[in-house]
Amino acid sequence: WWQALAAVLLFDPLAVLGVGTWLSFGLVAALIWACAGRLYEGKRQTAVRGQWAASVLSLVLLGYLFASLPLVSPLVNAVSIPWFSWVLTPLALLGSVVPFAPLQQAGAFLAEYTLRFLVWLADVSPEFAVAAAPLPLLVLAVCAALLLLLPRGLGLRPWAVLLLAGFVSYRPEAVPENEAAVTVWDAGQGLSVLVRTANRHLLFDTGTVAAAQTGIVPSLNAAGVRRLDKLVLSHHDSDHDGGFQAVGKIPNGGIYAGQPEFYEGARHCAEQRWQWDGVDFEFLRPSERKNIDDNGKSCVLRVVAGGAALLVTGDLDTKGEESLVGKYGGNLYSQVLVLGHHGSNTSSSGVFLNAVSPEYAVASSGYANAYKHPTEAVQNRVRAHGIKLLRTDLSGALQFGLGRGGVKAQRLRVYKFYWQKKPFE
């Protein structure tokens, strides 16, 4: 085990940063821990013990790495581990040294449809979301998993179960009353904003398919979001609603959209106000215009908590912004503005920036994106107004606290050591 790990790290030192390395070597270590040195055990007992070891440790690793636990994981492991070990891997190795086409084709066929089946099963199987636990609790959970794999006579398993229960049931600290926690996710060249109050959650847009599956949904699980009280889809564009199917697995209290005809059961984000836990929410709507494109139909959301405000405009263009200014005027004032259309030249006009007069402007854009968002013109315009520009492509996800004390901003990507900092930051 140690030699294999050393060989992998020798040829690819960065493999230690990969999830696959931790899962592969972690589960093999669990098998060795549970099965090595056991006397007077038959093959069936050894197989059951190995399955038990893989399931217990994967519970901790999957919960920490992906913030969710596939409930069918133990059953899938019980079937797939011997299938890969005794069928697919031998066929692949044999096909690499024996130039016999039917054998190679059979191996490729079985491997392809096995992976297709596993991907399908992952999509349809229920999952249990796990909040991101602090490091001390994670260490205790790993110790608990190892205790569960010790011989039964030691009497430590009940304590291990208690520790694992604490890991699985952990919930992050709640947002205080009359305050809001806002997270602008790093959704690549897309947009997704989570607004949390003491007891409620609203998600504005879902980003792209890839961003939702690999980042947003796991991040929602890690944040302890078990239900979305409102899901807002600003308009029908893949960088704003591409992750709808993935996020749609999370229960929600209603879907609101700028183009509700594209989503079953959705309602239009027309002008309406509501309050959650002392925090005011309002959908703003530009004046009616003719020949509006999809971007111009974007939902516009304003959130006010203790006098501090957030404004999100989706992909609203400059004409829509000017319409908002004419309709709402100084009531648009917000300390945090998520720039329209990822910082494109089609949004963030000088008139609009004057009306909103934000302290922070956030550009949700992908690193080195082909559109060069946020554009140089928008950056210059923002800085000319004395506004601090924050970018998800450089800083990752951004978090804002709204309350009576004003706005507190921080980035979620925290570097502890100087060598972890990227050159472009």
Where do the model's predicted regions map?
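A short helix->loop->beta-strand "cap" motif at the edges of active sites that frequently abuts
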Residues: 200, 251-260, 357-360, 385-387
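Cap/insert and terminal regions of metallo-dependent hydrolase folds
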Residues: 323-397
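Membrane-interface micro-motifs in multi-pass membrane enzymes
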Residues: 1, 16-27, 342
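Transmembrane helix-bundle segments that form internal channels/tunnels in multi-pass membrane proteins
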Residues: 6, 10, 19, 29-183, ...
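Core dinuclear metal-dependent hydrolase active-site scaffold
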Residues: 7-16, 122-230, 264-336, 394-425
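Active-site HxH/HxHxD metal-binding segment of metal-dependent hydrolases
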Residues: 232, 238-271
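Active-site environment of divalent metal-dependent phosphoester hydrolases
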Residues: 16, 210-211, 236-242, 262-264, ...
